A protein has these predicted regions:
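Phosphate-binding site recognition
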Residues: 1-328, 332
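A cross-kingdom feature that marks ATP-driven nucleic-acid transaction machinery
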Residues: 291, 301-463
């Protein structure tokens, strides 16, 4: 099934209908659905689909030759290899003389690593042959830093040749409801908290009717695909997976600043910074800075990928029980009772997405939404605000609190927000929002009726 990429597909098809040369760059982290989008687009269209190998230049030339010959002669059993990449690309030129042709190079970073001159060769043939052709070239890759700097960047030979680019992101918490619309809001939220909106993981989790059963069968089981996914992905992408595993484990255990992480891992801070950068490029980690402030001493690292965060939170500590096949016996006590705590950060992200993408009739035109933290110099205590919505212009801010627990939230939460808002901006104008899974007390509901605060439940986020 193909889900939730209708806008990208519509844009790609509109460009295809124009009939002239296109160079479309598609990139994003692994498992996010890039190949599924390309496959959907290519249906019913003459296509040479070449998926580059993490192998030598010659092996890639052989694979490219096979892709070209298979498109030309679907029933042929022999696939001769072109003498050079120039010959292979010229064959593409010849095929496009007769018809509109889609030419896909998937895993382009692998090809560029094996054949250093491929970007220059593509630049030359685009400029001298393909610019006036009917070729629809798609370059796709999972290494975001490579695609951004070596394909889209100013110093790339391909700079200025692209006609469109798509950075494919994980699906939002609302978009994933298309996979299992029968699930209630709490299970939809947990599904998002486990998979992070990655279609591949949602499919592998294979939820039928019960999410707990799906997790036990398809994640907390040594025979399941998802059980080994983080380690397999690190091995596939990185030369030193053990050290990267230690870095992620340190952050999962609570280390957030670079010096804390390097100390836990046991490597020098400069070396640790290189590992952190690679994990940032892969989309596994993220850097966070208090909203409205510039990166600096307050910058912290966090696990951005929900699936990695879930896995590192619950799998390593229960590895012996999982290996013994006894996870079902302790699931309630070892995993499920910690979901409210785990889902706290997930719920914050959902509330941020709601405000930026889905909320209607907001009192402020927002430019950005994020967290804020700092020191209350009166009490000398650290203050953290779950949600701060920064305005496009002016001094009016949205200040919010997110609570993912079953208890009702009371009026004291609004009072706390008011105190925190004064620490954030002394002369600001504030609109208060409180998000709660468990609802609100009567006193807080009355405060909403007086226009003092806007209250939203988990179910409201899906309406």
């Amino acid at each position: 099934m193909f889900y939730c990429r209708e806008e990208e597909l519509r844009t790609m098809n509109n460009r295809y209908k124009k009939g002239h040369f296109e160079c479309v760059v598609i990139y994003g982290r692994r498992r996010v659905g890039k190949t599924a989008l390309i496959n959907e687009f290519c249906k019913g269209k003459p296509t040479v689909y070449f998926s580059a190998l993490n192998a030598s230049s010659q092996e890639n030339l052989e694979a490219l030759s096979k892709a070209i010959y298979t498109c030309q002669n679907p029933d042929s059993t022999s696939t001769p290899t072109y003498r050079s990449y120039e010959d292979a690309l010229e064959a593409i030129t010849g095929m496009a003389m007769e018809k509109r042709l889609v030419f896909v190079i998937d895993e382009y970073p692998y090809l560029a690593k094996a054949e250093k001159s491929i970007s220059s060769r593509l630049q030359h043939i685009i400029d001298h042959s393909w610019q006036d052709s009917r070729i629809y070239l798609i370059l796709c890759g999972s290494s975001m830093s490579f695609m951004e700097y070596q394909v889209l960047g100013y110093e790339s030979p391909l700079y200025g040749r692209r006609t469109a680019q798509f950075k494919i992101q994980a699906l939002t918490y609302r978009e994933i409801t298309e996979f299992h619309p029968e699930l209630k809001a709490a299970d939809q939220a947990l599904l998002y908290g486990v998979t992070g909106g990655i279609p591949h993981y949602i499919n592998k989790l294979d939820v039928e009717s019960n999410l707990d059963e799906a997790l036990l069968d398809n994640l907390f089981s040594t025979s399941s695909y998802l059980f080994e996914e983080p380690e397999n992905l690190l091995k596939q992408e990185l030369r030193e997976p053990a050290i990267y595993n230690s870095v992620i484990s340190a952050i999962a255990a609570g280390a957030s600043r670079s010096n804390e992480i390097s100390t836990k891992v046991g490597v020098e801070s400069g070396i640790c910074a290189k590992y952190l950068k690679v994990l940032l490029d892969l989309g596994i980690l993220k850097k966070e800075t208090p909203i409205t402030e510039k990166p600096g001493k307050k910058t912290i690292y966090a696990i951005d990928d929900n699936f990695f965060r879930f896995w590192y939170r619950f799998v390593p500590r229960n590895m012996s029980v999982i290996s013994a096949g006894r996870m079902r016996l302790i699931y309630e006590q070892a995993v499920k009772r910690f979901y409210p705590d785990y889902m706290g950060l997930v719920f914050e992200k959902m509330c941020q997405e709601y405000l930026l993408r889905y909320a209607k009739d907001l009192p402020i035109l927002l430019s950005n939404v994020g967290q804020w933290w700092g020191t209350d110099y009166k009490t000398r205590r650290e203050v953290q605000i779950d949600i701060v919505g920064a305005p496009v212009d002016g001094n009016e801010y949205l200040i919010g609190s997110c609570k993912y627990r079953n208890e009702k939230i009371g009026i004291e939460e609004l009072e706390l927000l008011r105190r925190y808002a004064a620490v954030f901006r002394q002369n600001g104008i504030f609109r208060y929002y409180i998000f709660s899974k468990g609802g609100f007390t009567q006193a807080l509901l009355e405060a909403e009726m007086q226009g003092e605060v806007t209250l939203l439940t988990l179910e409201d986020l899906y309406r």
